[in-house]
């Protein structure tokens, strides 16, 4: 089952500048290289300064909260006969990035039994149509639900995504995506539940080794963790330990999910850790916090992260994220995320 991918909408970035032997060297030939943004800059409501930089030197990664087209979400798309429905209000954002990254927390299989309850997840394989519509480029399957229907379903999901042009984080080693001469490596790790076949599980030695391998192949290394305790504002010590481990091993950016609430960011050794983006496509309508999430927009200048913007969303109707347009509500979510960031008690090395 193959669906045609939507064309990415960021056309100014399509100029190929990688004509020299070292595209990275060319990227850094400018005398001006912006720094990692401060906490105040990250949580401001003004990121328009990026437009003053050369679009040819910029690459953007979009990361969402948990994507779970199972249970009520799966029922909705079947009812509407529209697998694009969850993404109709946000696809213009996710498509407008060089790389759109998700945590797909359910297998997508042919014979998914419909249900609106329970903790054993699956989604109809046609849900891949919505992912293609949303412009998803990379999916991490390193989580505690993708294996709910066994190793065969994990492989079926992996094959389905690959057939539709979506890269999948590997059980061993990085997956690489080249964006106009700058190579991004993605590594996904699950730290929730017991180890599952076909899923990359957290192991400190393995993480260090694979980050080292990724550093040899790519200019930018992104580590994706499924971690933490659900329904908490703050990361636990285990999350902080694993986040620091990845940065110490050479990661440039750490992306987290699983708690189903938004959690703070941390700047550690001039690198960024986002502990959790909240929910994105899920049916947890029973509280305000589980209906909220942020889309993380990570902008790189060459191999350097120079801007981070969080775009608040709210889920409606058991599975469709909508951008929050009310300025007060949007800033309330950002201010709360900033407050939790400032409260974060850092692990001292």
Regions found by a protein language model. Give the residues of each.
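Acidic, metal/ion-coordinating pockets
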Residues: 3-349
